[in-house]
Curated annotation (Swiss-Prot):
Pfam families: Ceramidase_alk (PF04734), Ceramidse_alk_C (PF17048). Its cofactor is Zn(2+). Zn(2+) binds at residues 151, 260, 498, 538. It comes from the Eukaryota. Residues 36-743 are lumenal. The keyword Metal-binding applies. One of its GO terms (molecular function) is N-acylsphingosine amidohydrolase activity. Optimum pH is 7.5 for N-dodecanoylsphing-4-enine hydrolysis. Pathway: Lipid metabolism; sphingolipid metabolism. Disruption phenotype: Fishes display severe embryonic morphological and cellular abnormalities such as abnormal morphogenesis in the head and tail, pericardial edema, defect of blood cell circulation, and an increase of apoptotic cells, especially in the head and neural tube regions, at 36 hours post-fertilization. It comes from Danio rerio. This is Neutral ceramidase.
Amino acid sequence: MASKSRRLSGLEISLIVLFLLMTAVSVALITVLALKQESDKKEEVTPEEPSPSVTPPEKPYLIGVGRADCTGPVADLPMMGYANTDQTARGLHTRLFSRAFIVDDGNKRVVFVTSDIGMVSQRLRLEVFQALKEKYGDLYRQDNVVLSGTHTHSGVGGYFQYTLFMITSKGYIKPSIQAIVSGIVKSIDIAHRNLRPGRIFINKGQVADSNFNRSPHSYMNNPEEERNRYEFNTDKQIVVLKFTDLDGDGIGLLSWFAVHPVSMNYTNRMVSSDNLGYASYIFEQEKNIGFLPGEKGPFVAGFSSSNLGDSSPNIRGPVCVNTGLKCDYINSSCPVGGKKACIAFGPGEDMFESTRIIGENMFKIAKELYGSAKQELHGPVYGAHQWVNMTDETVQFNSTHTGRTCKPALGHSFAAGTTDGGGEFNFLQGDTEGDPFWDGIRDAVLGPPSNETKACHQPKPILFSTGEMDSPLPWHPAIVDVQIITIGSLAVVAVPGEFTTMSGRRIREAVKRELEVKEPFTNAEVVVAGLCNIYTHYITTYEEYQIQRYEGASTIFGPHTLSAYIQRYRGLAKAIAHGTIGELPKGPEPPFFDEDKLFNQVRDPVADVAPVGTTFGDVLQEVNPVYKVGEIASVTFVSGNPRHSGDIRDTTLVTVERFHNDTGSWEIIHNDASWETRFHWIKGLAGRSQAKVEWHIPQTAQAGTYQIQYFGHYKQTTENTTVITPYVGTSAAFKVARSFYYF
């Protein structure tokens, strides 16, 4: 029987229509909301990376980054920076690295390398280019490769060919320079292999509470109208480059900031990358998740030196340590204790904490700038380079007035050192008179400076007339590199020494004026890269030179040094802007002295001897059974001389390992490049020595079972043979707890 259909009531029809309308409206609202969210995503630029959906408006650069270990010997060799031959290495705080950045515009390429070393010497640069030429022919040349040192004072020396520098670092030390040359070349190799299309963004900001002018009396001698243009007597600006691939993934950071890496003071005996190196370390550790420091993590963060000549990280300033009173403003000395009692201190309780604080300050601002960088660099890259005889430069001030540079000479205040450390005898900063006693000794031993040199350097009283001393080799260089590289609108002025704050400002302005007459430099950003290519001490302004504090006494080419450099760098900038680089004269090539003419005062280490009843790697002082986070786990081993380990690059002397119960295996959580580990070598008598390894247990350490291992080599000799043997020392297993109530 057919069912009878029921007619819908008016109420039911109304409800159905209302339901359909509400459904349609809901769908429409959801669609609009989805489209709006998608639109917002497209418009939003995240703070960490640029949107990969945005196609570069111009042909992208080829960019490559690379990092390589350049740590040399960590024992028994002089450290380079404080010019103290008694400050020899006795261990390892952090490893030293070379970081290379290559940019290619499709026609030309430029390379910037920043290395955790005191400075780049002429000898080092020439040996690097020998190695590069063997590998790459004329691809990497004097004009397109900049080599810069961070200026850590806690690296080993021995990579110079001029007598003065060889004296302070006990000669030309082959294992030291080989490690640095190999590390620099390897970092370029890695960057070369990793070249890919990418983008470069630039940003800048200010780093507070991280640098302090250690020679304010000199700075105040600059013209008042010039000083009034600046808020501070040191440069607070940090410039950051952000390197990404075309998908927007970050691959590198390169920055420049003006601060001396002397947070690790002159009492330090461990090789260390200091504050700039620590900033690189924590940035790379944050980016390279899952990699131990120094391993092949792909992200490279270079924190480079700038015009740091008078810029100290010891921001609490100098005080008389025996009274707590302020030091003398003019010569930085104290009524009791003289200049030795006048010491500047960093923000931390000790040099390690000060290093961490200054490094973190740079890291935090660089991270913010990296994340917010939106201004992109576009345009060609250029490199311009000349060799200049800085002993004979004529400076044209105007149509009627000229000046001359001088043969190198160091003033009496050079021997006074700075409030950051160094200095001997009764020498004081700010000395424009000299001392007949020391002049007499100099004349008897080294000979007096010529009248011409004395007149040229006025008002500097000359202590060492190094430009007139050439035994056994010249004491100072005469031929100096000047160089500029550009990437789009960015110009990097590679300077051969330590420019003071105002010197750096003047040269930046001069280069900027020359560049801005042409595209793409109409809004050029100019940075000073310090300690590049060759070391020539300090470069002050003419006015600062008159005061003759340490920096002025160390301006070796005389009062017109800065003016001569400005003239030369203006010439390079003009050639870049007008496309006439090829017309620049190459200049006189520097000497490359035969290795057999370079002296070495460092003796080979003697054979190692283990105490009776022990062997190498045995534990002499064992770890405690239990530690809590924040404490220091320490173990001492029978050791050989670390120099017997030879080339220690890409290895580790120390590991901290955590035991995994589930797998029954040990996992390395720290190596000797880690901030948390410290390796102390304790030299004894007659070939005996010890190695003390510390693990500064971080608050983030997991509770569990740990051990410390130490890897070394010992040397044994017989009448006809020398045998080098590896060994391993292992601590007892110990517990780490969040507190002592954990167990």
